[in-house]
């Protein structure tokens, strides 16, 4: 039952990201206000991190030992999650680049389809991590 709530928390973050996106105006399949898109991408990336953190806690990692950087996550994924799915590190890197770097940090994502597909990819990743 505990694992359900852990995944539920990550999915709650993802739903928050979708709610933020719904506030962004769209014209010709393009978001015309970058601020809510950046916020949504940042929140979706946090959902991915939350899912990984909760999985690691479930596997016995102490909270103080959780990764503190993207490189830390890249080190933890092969040790604890790659056993179950070898493509998770590649998927994590894609989500990091799309959601965190391009979407949140740089504010480069404006295409509605690309943003929505990125959030779908985040959900698929979260489901794999549980």
Please place each PLM-identified region on the residue numbering:
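Terminal alpha-helical segments
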Residues: 1-130
